[in-house]
Amino acid sequence: MACANGNGNANGLCIRDPLSWGAAAEALAGSHLEEVKRMVKEHREACIRLGGATLKVGQIAAVANGGSAAKVELDESARARVKASSDWVMDSMSKGTDSYGVTTGFGATSHRRTKQGGALQKELIRFLNAGIFGSGRDSCNTLPASTTRAAMLVRINTLLQGYSGIRFEILEAITRLLNNNVTPCLPLRGTITASGDLVPLSYIAGILTGRPNSKATAPDGAQIDASEAFRLAGITDGFFQLQPKEGLALVNGTAVGSGLASTVLYDANILAVLSEVFSAIFCEVMQGKPEFTDHLTHKLKHHPGQIEAAAVMEHILDGSSYMKMAKKLHELDPLQKPKQDRYALRTSPQWLGPQIEVIRSATKSIEREINSVNDNPLIDVSRNKALHGGNFQGTPIGVSMDNTRLAIASIGKLMFAQFSELVNDFYNNGLPSNLSGGRDPSLDYGFKGAEIAMASYCSELQFLANPVTNHVQSAEQHNQDVNSLGLISARKTEEAVHILKLMSTTFLVGLCQAIDLRHLEENLKSTVKTTISQVAKRVLTSGINGELHPSRFCEKDLIKVVDREHVFSYVDDPCSATYPLMQRLRQILVEHAMNNGEKEKDADTSIFRKISAFEDELKVVLPKEVESARVAYENGTSAIKNRIEECRSYPLYRFVREETGTSLLTGENVRSPGEEFDKVFNAICEGRLVDPLLECLEDWNGAPLPIC
């Protein structure tokens, strides 16, 4: 691969950066969000041109999805170097040069010798076809087609660099299979990703050589044999008779592990940004204190992931209508909630920052791997030699995937902690228990089932966080005595990402439920205040003979009661004597009566005598007004509009409510939470959440707000 800054020598080494640490550091320049935006852009490219050195995670994720419009093209400039290495192998064998995998046996039996190079490659593919598929099309022992497509793309890219001794025509054939959405069937298990992903990759070779046991999946999902696969792909020259080294070139690489790792990391990076935005929305609906995002706090900690996470949250919360309202509430009653928010909110930048750094570092490691030459031996045409080494060892994959999985589990743990606060009326600052949205809390248990499911998801996710790479077994007659387990780790990380999508779905729908409940709360509170004010004016202002009554001074304090009491603590039966509203209103009237002094002895000026009249009038009027306000909300005609429309987080809410067609969940509705979750989950899996997510941050300049 060429030196990134152009400062190279004849041997292909970078003079200024011979160990590539500089290039690795340079790759991490800029914000994580900008990198995610770049990935998304690459994911949407119509054409992916492969040359061996510039393949990206986003491109692999695009091709992995068979429904993608992205087409793969091979850089014609690679043809000459690929041919040169292939010619070198043939020339070397004709001269009788001894070379591993060309004239020798494999692995621990490389002491064996043969001059039948083609037959040796044929046998290699045969004995590596050791996978188990089971019976039936729906067998769970087949690698998903998306992973196979990713592996095919990565393997082409590696072989294009011209160090592997394979014909260009074989790479063109694999490309045709990709572009025509014809996917070889590979076994799910059976590789330790050292020497590369031998067993699964041998099934791609099996299709190319027309092995009778080889199967592929057609564009319509039907299972087909190798002949039909070639026909559908438009490959007309017949099956390949492998030349010396070509079988080894096809199978001895890390493409399956690194291909899957790429698709996993594409999702992981997006989910990491989503978790940052979730934390900001969580702050909004919980009436939190945005002080936790102040740049000085995070600047003094120095960690870039933390600094960026805080800056992203700060941007979402800056100017938020919810934060303006929360500030007024905190000023009205500083003791209504703790001085500091709980850790799930207040330390969310410190928690998410290291996870973002890990995921970002893993992404860069995998991008180096997918652009590497990772087979053995390597053909160095310029020095006229075959180099025997171990680039097939997929340790970067195993380690990166283990680390990513741990980061994913930590993100999930934070989501669970935040969700647990959100649904708990002891912690959620006035929202109803279980986020129940119906009129009767005794017949509406909201997100109770969802909270149980979240606990299940989180538990499984924490289990998956355990490492894979410490379970290595010595293999192949103790020749492969250390091995990376890269694909196994990538598969487990794919599972973890899937579970995090389930958690993200549940949490996002819960956040939108909370947003709607805050909207309902604000309208109900306004209605209660207006009604109490009107009743107070009618009942408390005047005496029997029309004279001004001392109880008229109670109105202001009665309104303060409404400001301080959580609406959902009483609104299902607002005039119940067992609920806090009526108790506090009566307490205010009693306190005023006790301060009324001698006037209480006069029936015309007694405040005590007004209490029953006030309560009786309120019982007649308030329930009707509350119901009218709720009906107006349900009809979309509320007097006060939803504050979310004035917030930077609005695109996500709009997406969930309008694009996926969900609405407020109530016990009065037949629709279950799971039905709504499915809509959002499918949208996330289809990638439709990406644009609304990035829209939330489209005007962020990549820097924290100035310290003032």
From Swiss-Prot:
Q: Which PROSITE patterns match?
A: PAL_HISTIDASE (PS00488)
Residue positions where 2,3-didehydroalanine (Ser) is found in the record: 195
Record's superkingdom?
Eukaryota
Q: One short Pfam family name for this protein?
A: Lyase_aromatic
Q: Which reaction does it catalyse?
A: L-phenylalanine = (E)-cinnamate + NH4(+)
The yes or no answer to whether the keyword Cytoplasm is present is: yes
Q: What class of enzyme is it?
A: lyase
**Does this UniProt record's set of keywords contain Repeat?**
no
This protein's assembly is summarised as: Homotetramer.
NCBIfam families (alphabetical): phe_am_lyase
- Its protein name is Phenylalanine ammonia-lyase 1
Q: What is the lineage of its organism?
A: Eukaryota, Viridiplantae, Streptophyta, Embryophyta, Tracheophyta
UniProt gene name: PAL1
